[in-house]
Amino acid sequence: MDSFMKRVLFLSGPVLTLALSGCLSEPSSDAKRPEKAAEPVTGQLALYRMYQVARSWAPDVEVLAMHSIHVTEVPDVVGSAGAWQATFISEMKNAARSYTYSVIEADPNLHLGVFAGQPESSTNGLTTPFLIATVKVDTNAAYKTALAKTSEAANEQKTHTISFLLDKQEKFTNPSWRVVWGESVGTAGLSAYIDASTGEYLATMH
């Protein structure tokens, strides 16, 4: 066998070994890893996400109200929600605008991330606009306080979805979280107000 053929045979061994090892290699860890399920978020986090987008519409926006949205495709975690809707108001534009924040795309009205609605004429209601900086207490902490201060809550939480509303009413000094045992205030038999600035318990509603 001449020297050329010897060199060819000598080189083909490592090349073949590499080719076989490539075929037999294990799939990457990324290929094995299942897609992570969407997780709900707390109210304060969702509020700040929407506020960042709302400021591009009007730099003087203040919060008018916010509420949680129950999304059946997202796991229930007390103190969090799969989606939230907030309304911001601009004195400069004399208008209000609603935004949603969702952790998943859920047709027809919920879109992944922050989604802006159309501006509407500003109207005076029962709630007062407030600065986002006054919301210092998150929904998970508000829930714990409401549960501790409301004796009936332990039984109610076993059979009801927990919902949250944020606004500033005339009867309270600061904006407040309303922790609702139910999907809405209208259908709930129990709710509690927690100060969104200090975390103090304010009142129970039946």
Each model region followed by its residue ranges:
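Long, terminal "pre-/pro-" and other extracytoplasmic accessory regions
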Residues: 9, 23-206
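Secretory targeting signatures
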Residues: 1-26
